From Swiss-Prot:
Subunit structure: Part of the 30S ribosomal subunit. Contacts protein S5. The interaction surface between S4 and S5 is involved in control of translational fidelity.
Family: Belongs to the universal ribosomal protein uS4 family.
Function statement: One of the primary rRNA binding proteins, it binds directly to 16S rRNA where it nucleates assembly of the body of the 30S subunit.
Gene: rpsD
Protein name per its UniProtKB record: Small ribosomal subunit protein uS4
Keywords, ordered alphabetically: Ribonucleoprotein, Ribosomal protein, RNA-binding, rRNA-binding
Sections of the chain in a coiled coil: none
Annotated Gene Ontology cellular component terms: small ribosomal subunit
A Gene Ontology molecular function term of the record: rRNA binding
InterPro entries for the chain: Ribosomal_uS4 (IPR022801), Ribosomal_uS4_bac-type (IPR005709), Ribosomal_uS4_CS (IPR018079), Ribosomal_uS4_N (IPR001912), S4_RNA-bd (IPR002942), S4_RNA-bd_sf (IPR036986)
Source taxonomy: Bacteria, Bacillati, Cyanobacteriota, Cyanophyceae, Synechococcales
Signal sequence range: none
Amino acid sequence: MSRYTGPRLKIIRRFGGLDLPGLTRKRPKNTNPPGMHGAERKKKSEYAIRLEEKQKVRFNYGLSERQMIRYMRKARRSKGSTGLALLQMLEMRLDCIVFRLGMAPTIPAARQLVSHGHIEVNGQKVTIPSYGCKVGDVITVKNKESSRKLVAAYAEYPGLFLPDYLEFDKEKLRGRIKELPPREQICAPVNELLVVEFYSRKL
């Protein structure tokens, strides 16, 4: 299953108007799922509930199913909570870090910045959105007028709160990762335990 590139508000409606900040900052006027008129909904099976949680993660972080499986396998090999390890790996992707720093309004916009060569990590240009950042990494904008103007305009966009595990100098357009993100500062409205349960029968 490839990464979703269709209408984003349609996905938000599918989840009853749930806020997925990585996908879009817009809000639909109608929060009923597409094709459903009125508020009546069928009771979901346990499988459907787990599937929905998995899909929330996929759409919020802009992942393909193949990428999800790869991250899940890595998370299962890590120490501690598999669910937390999964979310931390996703949050430490370069496109997500750029988004959390406020350099882009959404993860898709951050992904475009990275792939077009506007972002550097520790002084080196990185064009892979899935690049796994590490604690201590310094994320900056390429020292080019067009790059700095683009990110400066994005930085004026009313974004999410800057989490404590990051620091950002708005004048220099420079960010640094201070520590791994704790669960309470990961703005992903998902139940990661259900995501782990979903894949436990598949991997």
